[in-house]
Amino acid sequence: MGRTRVVIWFRNDLRLLDNACVARAATLASESSDVEVVPVYVFDETYFKPSKRGLARFGAGRGKFTLECVGDLKTSLRALGSDLLVRCGKSRDVIAELTLTGANDRTIILTQTEVTSEETEMDVAVERATRERARGGAASATMERHWGSTLYHIDDVPFDVTSGLSDLPDVFTPFRNKVESKCKVRDVIPAPTANELGHVPASVEGFEWMPKPSDLPFASSEIAMDCDKRIKDCLDERSVLDFKGGESNALARVKYYLWESDRLATYFETRNGMLGGDYSTKLAPWLALGCVSPRHVVSEIRRYESERVENKSTYWVIFELIWRDFFKFFALKHGNKIFHLDGTAGRRASWKRDEKILKAWKTGTTGYPLIDANMRELAATGFMSNRGRQNVASWLALDAGIDWRHGADWFEHHLLDYDTASNWGNWCAAAGMTGGRINRFNIAKQTKDYDPAGEYIKTWVKELAEVPAAYIADPNQAPRELRDRIGLNYPNKLALPRRDFTEMGSPPGPRRGGGGGGRGRGRPGGSTPNRGTKARVASVYDTVYG
């Protein structure tokens, strides 16, 4: 009788609570004392390579947060009597080395199901490498994929999974109506208890190692040094929250937002804020790396509704999590089209590459204060409000006419909550490339509606600290005497091209409630498609971003 090794390949599921792979490993370990469980996480070099447009995909802020998430998981596993093997390199090589090769040995790799091409190709590479290694020694290797990233399980959604979700609506409201009426959120899977995963095998070496920023395969040494600096010293005092990675911090945030601060009760009224830690849940970074599951969040919300209050705010957080699900399933349906310039609708448009405009957008020097404030916050903290994300995406893609994929790349580099499906699906939609009405944001009106006194702008654009609220949307329109008196040193608005949206088959739609297709008050959950165009997907940043 050969040995059995169970490899838990952690990726975007860095938690023990409500983790199907962990639960499956515990079950297998309970069947025989000969079963050994090896949890592993790989900082795969694939994700650190530059994008097709030359930008480093994995930035310093993401590096810091991910290291914290992995370290927290390692600590939790050690508390159970297990451990986490952490490696840098290629997942296929690392996991192949863990494959048993003795006669009649078997290796079972457990991993969370992912939906986008890079991850699924990685799955195939790991599966092939482990099988080849096992066969060389008359052993066997299999991979089990377990669904775990969404609120609704893929086996429960009322769409045809066998056809690649070809019948999934391309607008949110029909999707939401169907899943809410026909799906039940599954119960949260309990976390393992002490010794349920057994002890890691002595034959596997290197459990004591935990990488430093300099060990990660960053695209440059400068990014590694910035990552190290962020770990050692640097919470920007203007940051909305001191984001610390890991399941323990994620669960603490859920507890704080719902039970300790009671802010859930007023979420609907505050969710469009841009300053402070509690205008929204701020769960997005932990959700993106799987430090907390949406099912656990909803389970706690249901308990809150039972014990305290059920209102529009409690529902709205769940509503946002359903948006998150929508983009995950949308990516599964459309595949690599979410990365294509013409988008999922195949719309043709004239895009430009203007390095001056793109650089100004990235550095927050466009001359549009609301845009500049949001972009500076992103660079400094790795976070931006939902409201800000909608505005900066609309400005870059629809006002400046810059290839929207540069914006998606920049977000991928910086966002602590980077999630492939959400980021690329939302940017594709913001650029009008998912079909239907194009939602173009009026930045001056957005400033008036959401930062009328300029409090947020002045927090991040210090050179505007003395500008009166009446001129905060366009400081250079202030009287010369005022500008001279306060020593205003702020760039004029960049001259932008006049866009012809008729070539895209749909004129810009009117804004409603100051938000239109966004996650704010004005977002229609869906709309009637314009004649001659495909159905619309609202330009919305999922969840809990805000």
Swiss-Prot record:
Which residue ranges does the record annotate as region Disordered?
497-546
State where composition is biased (Gly residues): 511-525
> Cross-referenced SUPFAM superfamilies, in alphabetical order?
Cryptochrome/photolyase FAD-binding domain (SSF48173), Cryptochrome/photolyase, N-terminal domain (SSF52425)
Q: Name one GO cellular component term.
A: chloroplast
Q: Which GO terms describe its molecular function?
A: deoxyribodipyrimidine photo-lyase activity; DNA binding; FAD binding
UniProt KW Transcription keyword: no
- Gene Ontology process terms (BP): photoreactive repair
Carries keyword Mitochondrion? Answer: yes
Keywords per UniProt: Chloroplast, Chromophore, DNA-binding, FAD, Flavoprotein, Mitochondrion, Plastid, Transit peptide
What cofactor does its activity depend on? FAD; (6R)-5,10-methylene-5,6,7,8-tetrahydrofolate
The Photolyase/cryptochrome alpha/beta domain is annotated at 4-151
Cofactor binding, note field: Binds 1 FAD per subunit. Binds 1 5,10-methenyltetrahydrofolate (MTHF) per subunit.
- Which InterPro entries does the record cross-reference, listed alphabetically? Cry_DASH, Crypto/Photolyase_FAD-like_sf, Crypto/Photolyase_N_sf, Cryptochr/Photolyase_FAD-bd, Cryptochrome/DNA_photolyase_1, DNA_photolyase_1_CS_C, DNA_photolyase_N, Rossmann-like_a/b/a_fold
Q: Where is it localised?
A: Plastid, Chloroplast; Mitochondrion
Looking up NCBIfam families in the UniProt record yields:
crypto_DASH (TIGR02765)
Give a short account of what the protein does. Answer: May have a photoreceptor function. Binds ss- and ds-DNA in a sequence non-specific manner, lacks photolyase activity.
The UniProt family comment states: Belongs to the DNA photolyase class-1 family.
Protein name per its UniProtKB record: Cryptochrome DASH, chloroplastic/mitochondrial
Q: What is the lineage of its organism?
A: Eukaryota, Viridiplantae, Chlorophyta, Mamiellophyceae, Mamiellales
